[in-house]
């Protein structure tokens, strides 16, 4: 808990800054050494953080939300001695660099504009037991779905248009929305055509907005297709002409009947940007790529704790007026589209004047023999350290 709190109060994943922000009345080196030892030798920290995050955030997920799942990357090209480092594609520059794959799932409420991070996992193709990226994606989806009561729509970019993934989704009856990658033939009207061939021939009978609240409308069409491997399992394709060179082609397992449902699917796909923005927030807001640790366990634990810290901010995004006020960054009174940078700045400002945070009870326990108090529940739905802020 204290490491997560240190991440929030320091705004970084650097262990020296985390230790400094905890303000323990002992040498900084001792605090940093204790945190470093805990992160390096206890690989169960990442699993525990994931479970806590899912237990707190999963009950907030409803049928109307979307779950954006997106493979990302952690660039470690400047740290060649990092343990189990592999080769990944840098999403910012497009280069192949040394680093680790990231996998994140974010719940997005399209109507209210709220974002809830569910899980972020650091992976490595060089780790023991690695099978494939497809297996990693399915494992994360299964872990998240295990904590959910609802069956929301999973949204993934064109990297998810893979035969093994479609096989698992269809056989497990998942609600998914995937952007077609134009690398396969679909069964369509007694023919076999690629996604772009269908897009050129399909009449676009409907009109709707690309994003919720926009007035400008674009033409789109809806048709039924199937995979060659599963000809009896219908899928629905939505083709959108939005001014770019190639039409946007979306395929879903969820039935699409009429203009309104088609428009809602378009909104759902374009709102998956929240997952990409989440990666950017983890890298910039918490300075993930500036971490100097080399052990894979340490990096894995820090990524999981950063995701937990983001989830804690998310639990206050609708009632975090005091945190936003502390940030003093918003020139407009309108609610920010992605409020977590401001919430993080407000959190740092809120505790910047504190002398000590967690240490006093340790001193009382040593002198009086008292037992340690239970750790406070920092999430907004339970009375805890920040419950009075609500």
Locate predicted features:
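Active-site-proximal, Lys/Arg-enriched surface segment
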Residues: 4-5, 32-112, 223-225
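Single, function-defining residue in the core of a domain
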Residues: 1-12, 21-24, 31, 50, ...
């Amino acid at each position: 808990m204290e490491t997560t709190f240190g991440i929030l109060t320091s705004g970084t994943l650097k262990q020296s800054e985390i230790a400094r922000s905890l303000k323990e009345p002992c040498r900084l080196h001792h605090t940093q050494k204790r945190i470093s030892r805990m992160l390096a030798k206890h690989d169960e920290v990442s699993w525990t953080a994931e479970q806590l995050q899912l237990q707190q955030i999963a009950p907030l997920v409803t049928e109307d939300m979307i779950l954006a799942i997106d493979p990302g990357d952690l660039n470690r090209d400047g740290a060649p001695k990092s343990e189990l480092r592999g080769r990944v594609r840098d999403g910012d520059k497009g280069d192949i660099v040394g680093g680790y794959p990231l996998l994140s799932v974010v719940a997005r409420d399209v109507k209210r504009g709220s974002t809830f991070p569910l899980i972020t996992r650091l992976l490595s193709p060089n780790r023991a037991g690695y099978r494939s990226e497809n297996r990693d994606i399915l494992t994360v989806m299964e872990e998240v779905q295990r904590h959910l009561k609802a069956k929301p729509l999973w949204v993934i970019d064109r990297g998810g248009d893979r035969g093994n993934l479609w096989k698992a989704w269809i056989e497990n009856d998942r609600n998914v929305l995937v952007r077609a990658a134009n690398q396969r033939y679909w069964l369509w009207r007694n023919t076999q055509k690629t996604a772009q061939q269908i897009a050129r021939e399909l009449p676009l009978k409907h009109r709707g907005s690309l994003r919720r609240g926009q007035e400008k409308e674009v033409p789109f069409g809806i048709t039924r297709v199937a995979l060659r491997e599963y000809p009896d399992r219908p899928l629905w394709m939505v083709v959108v002409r939005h001014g770019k060179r190639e039409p946007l082609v979306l395929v879903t397992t969820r039935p699409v009947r009429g203009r309104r449902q088609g428009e809602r699917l378009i909104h759902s796909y374009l709102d998956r940007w929240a997952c990409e923005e989440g990666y950017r927030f983890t890298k910039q807001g918490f300075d993930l790529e500036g971490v100097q640790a080399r052990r894979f366990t340490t990096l894995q634990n820090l990524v999981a704790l950063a995701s937990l810290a983001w989830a804690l901010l998310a639990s206050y995004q609708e009632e975090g007026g005091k945190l936003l006020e502390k940030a003093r960054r918003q020139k407009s009174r309108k609610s920010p589209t992605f409020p977590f940078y401001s919430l993080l700045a407000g959190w740092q400002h809120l505790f910047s004047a504190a002398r000590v945070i967690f240490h006093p009870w340790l001193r009382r326990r040593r002198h009086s023999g008292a037992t340690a108090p239970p750790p406070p529940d920092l999430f907004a739905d339970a009375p805890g350290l920040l419950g009075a802020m609500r």
